[in-house]
Amino acid sequence: MSRFVDKLPLFDRRPSPMEEAEGLPRSGYLGQLHHHQYYQPHSNMLPLEQSPPTSTKHTSVTLAQLLKRVNDARSGSSTPISSPRYTIELGGSKPESVSSESDDHHSDDGGSEGQPRALVLKFTDLTYSVKQRRKGSCLPFRRAAADEPELPAMRTLLDGISGEARDGEIMAVLGASGSGKSTLIDALANRIAKESLHGSVTINGESIDSNLLKVISAYVRQEDLLYPMLTVEETLMFAAEFRLPRSLPTREKKKRVKELIDQLGLKRAANTIIGDEGHRGVSGGERRRVSIGVDIIHNPIMLFLDEPTSGLDSTSAFMVVTVLKAIAQSGSVVVMSIHQPSYRILGLLDRLLFLSRGKTVYYGPPSELPPFFLDFGKPIPDNENPTEFALDLIKEMETETEGTKRLAEHNAAWQLKHHGEGRGYGGKPGMSLKEAISASISRGKLVSGATDGTMSVAASDHSAPPPSSSSVSKFVNPFWIEMGVLTRRAFINTKRTPEVFIIRLAAVLVTGFILATIFWRLDESPKGVQERLGFFAIAMSTMYYTCSDALPVFLSERYIFLRETAYNAYRRSSYVLSHTIVGFPSLVVLSFAFALTTFFSVGLAGGVNGFFYFVAIVLASFWAGSGFATFLSGVVTHVMLGFPVVLSTLAYFLLFSGFFINRDRIPRYWLWFHYISLVKYPYEAVMQNEFGDPTRCFVRGVQMFDNTPLAALPAAVKVRVLQSMSASLGVNIGTGTCITTGPDFLKQQAITDFGKWECLWITVAWGFLFRILFYISLLLGSRNKRR
């Protein structure tokens, strides 16, 4: 633990007097919290210093130019930086250059009143309600029981929540399950539709565009959504390639990743895979820190986290919050939800917001918890964690009829009495939003998209409006770079999970072997013709059933995709194309494997040309089948829902393909299903490839009696029957006379709509269509906002 905290640049590692008195190790412990002294910041944890800004001209400076100037300054250039520079002192003593205003940066009240802050996130009267349905209300015939209580039509998840978060501090949202913690984090992170959320969220007093917020912020979900087969370093490097501008050299991106690995305490695990249930990887705490690192790779100005310590032991949770404290002190606004912080974690938090049934029941620094509850008539006992006491009391008050309301009213009265109406805990913004972004760039914040030159920051123009959505580039990299990075990442994942391809190849080879041995060397008799029909129907449908394993591929990546695209890491079109490129080589291998196993063994016609056409139609079938499964994976949300849909739909496709019933016999009201059947076109294609030659004869002379009651007659009798037929019809029909050619058989099967090449291209077109539909499903179904 001490080695981990020692690496963090924002903490002086000399033990505090309390640590020395109690003989505690140098573990970053911020002191035991006692009654009326629950929050005592580390004495050597220094605030950010604001040096006097250099003179600037009244001209707009792009973020790209600011970033370039910062890089020049770091490399020793004399280029001036036209924004305030914030520095962090690492020593134990306070340097003389730190202004007296900084001394109160971590005062008990959370900061001195009126002290200018670079960034202040303020939220006022946030209210959010959702429709509430009774269980089973979707059934039209269900009526509520007489004794069933009437439920309100709307359920309020947030009820007039107000507060503010500042750079350099951590604001923690606490409450029991269902109190509205995650909902509030989503509201602040712009993950709730504007038409559903009431109230205002501003930064430095200015409303912010959603596209700009995506650029300067990051959101860390409660779940660890990572690729299990990538190492820690690879995961962060891919995040850097997605979030950092392409004008930044690769060596600088690698340097940023190395620094972040050190900051997160992941140096020993850098070359370890993330892991999952079947592959051993990093620990739970390390995985959580990697999740945070992925979203802070571009050093965001604002960081929102949904229960980052959930599921971790106390040591791992403390390490995670310590990292967040370092991020906050680097000049970021950090807002997180947390269930129940320990003593040590509480010492790292600057501001608490307790929720109960969507209402604010306490808002302020940890140091004010004891007097707050003392004034409420519920003093916190000595040596008890104040947050545990508060959460237990809030839970107890929720069982009372007006308990939550009384506590919320007490909080409102407390705020009015101690902080005044409309008066926060200090930290008034000392600059406009544009100036704040400019200052963040000068501190080394690599704002995503900053080098596109599309978003300008007028550091000296106080009257200029904040950047609009039209001036903010949505994506850092161009389309082809995104596709290249996504393709490379997918190939690495595929290479490290060879068992997935091996299982598919084994399934194809086993199926081909079984078909080859059953339909070995078919002859050109009527019986051989019927056996060919069965082989083609089973073979073509096998292609589609084999592709059903593509369904869980995207479903396993679904939430990773949602996390990455929520902040415009890449375009959805880039993902679809890279997904297609990575999957295509395996389809080629599977097609050749199946064709080599069956074509010559069954004795199909066409020679070399026929073989390569057979390979092409098998490949087209794999292409269309994988596209169909991919499309469904974008529509359904769970693999247990997807497989029944895939299997049942493919069964219908086979039923209407023309094998079981000819097109001429299908009822007219079902004929449309025949034409959308994916099996129809490859089935008819291989049939025409086999029976399209008019010189091949499949029924000669007495063979016409095969598969009829006359088949059991002696050969001599069959010959006499042929002679009688010849005399009656006036046509000479001998034992060698060709009765049915290949084209004749195709007409009998009603395979006359399309030629074999048309069937091939239609099958290929189905594959493209399903991938386009997959892209549309990602556009419509991958929204990251609540309604």
Curated annotation (Swiss-Prot):
It holds the Pfam family ABC_tran. It is found in: Cell membrane. Residues 121-382 form the ABC transporter domain. ATP binds at G175, A176, S177, G178, S179, G180, K181, S182. Residues 74-85 have a biased composition (Polar residues). It is a multi-pass membrane protein. Residues 484-691 form the ABC transmembrane type-2 domain. SUPFAM superfamilies: P-loop containing nucleoside triphosphate hydrolases. Keywords: ATP-binding, Cell membrane, Developmental protein, Membrane, Nucleotide-binding, Stress response, Transmembrane, Transmembrane helix, Transport. Residues 1-17 have a biased composition (Basic and acidic residues). The chain crosses the membrane at residues 500-520, 535-555, 576-596, 599-619, 620-640, 641-661, 728-745, 760-780. InterPro entries: AAA+_ATPase (IPR003593), ABC2_TM (IPR013525), ABC_transporter-like_ATP-bd (IPR003439), ABC_transporter-like_CS (IPR017871), ABCG_dom (IPR043926), ABCG_transporters (IPR050352), P-loop_NTPase (IPR027417). GO terms for cellular component: Casparian strip; plasma membrane; suberin network. One of its GO terms (molecular function) is ATP hydrolysis activity. Residues 1-25, 71-116 are annotated as: Disordered. GO terms for biological process: cellular response to hypoxia; cellular response to salt stress; positive regulation of response to salt stress; potassium ion homeostasis; regulation of secondary shoot formation; response to abscisic acid; response to auxin; response to gibberellin. Belongs to the ABC transporter superfamily. ABCG family. Eye pigment precursor importer (TC 3.A.1.204) subfamily. Essential transporter for growth and development under abiotic stress. Mediates shoot branching by promoting the outgrowth of lateral shoots. Required for salt tolerance via Na/K homeostasis, at least partly by regulating SKC1/OsHKT1;5. Necessary for hypodermal suberization of roots, which contributes to formation of the apoplastic barrier. This is ABC transporter G family member 5. It comes from Oryza sativa subsp. indica (Rice).
